Amino acid sequence: MSVDTQKVIEDNKRSAQDTGSPEVQVALLTARIELLTGHFKTHKKDHHSRRGLLQMVNRRRSLLDYLKKKDNERYKSLIEKLGLRR
């Protein structure tokens, strides 16, 4: 079980060579967060990985805040595309 990084990048890139835009970073973090969330359904006591999950959630939150501040339209389309609350 792992994230298909190339597929996530392909689905969210803004240009042909784009791998580091906030949209791509948020999409990759979202995919990893969803994967870890499923992991915790069976491994309830895995607190070490839970800390990593919280770090990813916080990083995604800061990237989303940055994107919202820079370009609100891109922010709105991204959260709608990824199905995030807000």
UniProtKB/Swiss-Prot annotation:
Keywords: Ribonucleoprotein, Ribosomal protein, RNA-binding, rRNA-binding. One of its GO terms (biological process) is translation. One of its GO terms (molecular function) is structural constituent of ribosome. GO terms for cellular component: cytosolic small ribosomal subunit. InterPro entries: Ribosomal_uS15, Ribosomal_uS15_bac-type, uS15_NS1_RNA-bd_sf. It comes from the Bacteria. Residues 1-22 are annotated as: Disordered. Disulfide bonds: none annotated. Pfam families: Ribosomal_S15. Residues 7-16 have a biased composition (Basic and acidic residues). Belongs to the universal ribosomal protein uS15 family. Part of the 30S ribosomal subunit. Forms a bridge to the 50S subunit in the 70S ribosome, contacting the 23S rRNA. One of the primary rRNA binding proteins, it binds directly to 16S rRNA where it helps nucleate assembly of the platform of the 30S subunit by binding and bridging several RNA helices of the 16S rRNA. Forms an intersubunit bridge (bridge B4) with the 23S rRNA of the 50S subunit in the ribosome. This is Small ribosomal subunit protein uS15. It comes from Xanthomonas oryzae pv. oryzae (strain KACC10331 / KXO85).
